[in-house]
């Protein structure tokens, strides 16, 4: 009973710290879902995120689901290229009849990132120390690490570094062949947040599976089958969310639009 109560207290502490961090980053007046002005101030990319979400929310449903053709110029676009947290964009668009016209979810995402950064770092440290106290103290260092703080308030999707901590926790605590479903779910989840994290997590998962194949004598057939399933599910997710809406030829063409400012007859 004591352990359960103590763990609940730790989670409550993490929630409180996460909320205080959120206030420090966005300000108490900007915590509300209705507050959007702060996203257009500063040198970060928050205005890009909010504009992408605004166009996406006010458009009809299309397929792929992440299609956002009204955001951009002269070629189709997708919510993923606005770095607007596709998983939340899709969720809140499905609720657009119930949310106000001026609406943002980025402060909520910061709160989630702060909490999960603390939560998973606590779990990892606890694995090695066995001490709740040391783990709580150690988790604070993950919260104030420069590589994390540098992304906060600059690139909201890249503040989701808890995804990497989750992957590290899985690698440390679960046998890779027994936790493959969790790994695949994590890979799919990361692709709905930012593809950079997907690349890193897929690399970690692949190395662990190769290690398991070589030293644990895992079946090669099972190895290939699992990777085929993972790849199929990942590419299906990428397609549905709209990662392939911009053609490679369009994105790489030289002198796009011939530098034009105005349409010339």
Listing of model-derived features with the role each one plays in the protein:
Residues 23-28, 128, 170-176, 207-217, ...:
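Structural signal for the C-terminal ends of transmembrane alpha-helices
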Residues 231, 235-265:
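Periplasmic/ER-lumenal interhelical loops and adjacent helix-loop junctions
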Residues 19-117, 145-159:
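Membrane-interface coil-to-helix junctions
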Residues 111, 115-124, 133-174, 179-211:
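Membrane-embedded helix bundles of polyisoprenyl
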Residues 198-232:
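Perimembrane helix-loop-helix junctions
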Residues 91, 95, 121, 125, ...:
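Alpha-helical membrane-inserting segments
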Residues 1-33, 222-231:
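Start-transfer (signal-anchor) and selected internal transmembrane alpha helices
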């Amino acid at each position: 009973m004591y352990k359960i109560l103590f763990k609940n207290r730790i989670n409550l502490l993490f929630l409180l710290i996460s909320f205080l961090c959120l206030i420090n980053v966005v300000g108490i007046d900007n915590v509300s879902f209705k507050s959007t002005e702060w996203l257009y101030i500063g040198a970060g990319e928050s205005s890009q995120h909010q504009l992408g979400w605004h166009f996406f929310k006010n458009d009809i449903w299309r397929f792929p689901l992440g299609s956002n053709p009204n955001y951009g110029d002269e070629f189709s676009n997708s919510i993923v290229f606005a770095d607007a947290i596709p998983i939340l964009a899709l969720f809140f668009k499905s609720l657009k009849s119930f949310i106000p016209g001026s609406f943002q979810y980025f402060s909520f995402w910061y709160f989630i990132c702060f909490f999960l950064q603390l939560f998973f770092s606590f779990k990892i440290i606890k694995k090695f120390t066995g001490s709740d106290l040391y783990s709580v103290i150690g988790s604070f260092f993950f919260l104030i690490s420069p590589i994390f703080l540098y992304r906060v308030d600059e690139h909201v999707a890249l503040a989701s570094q808890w995804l990497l901590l989750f992957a590290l926790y899985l690698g440390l605590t679960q046998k890779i062949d027994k936790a493959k479903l969790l790994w695949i779910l994590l890979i799919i989840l990361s692709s709905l947040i930012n593809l950079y994290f997907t690349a890193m997590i897929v690399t970690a998962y692949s190395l662990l599976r190769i290690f398991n194949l070589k030293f644990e004598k895992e079946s090669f057939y099972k190895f290939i089958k699992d990777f085929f399933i993972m790849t199929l599910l990942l590419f299906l997710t990428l397609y549905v969310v709209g990662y392939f809406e911009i053609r490679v030829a369009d994105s790489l063409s030289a002198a796009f639009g011939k530098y034009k400012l105005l349409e010339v007859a």
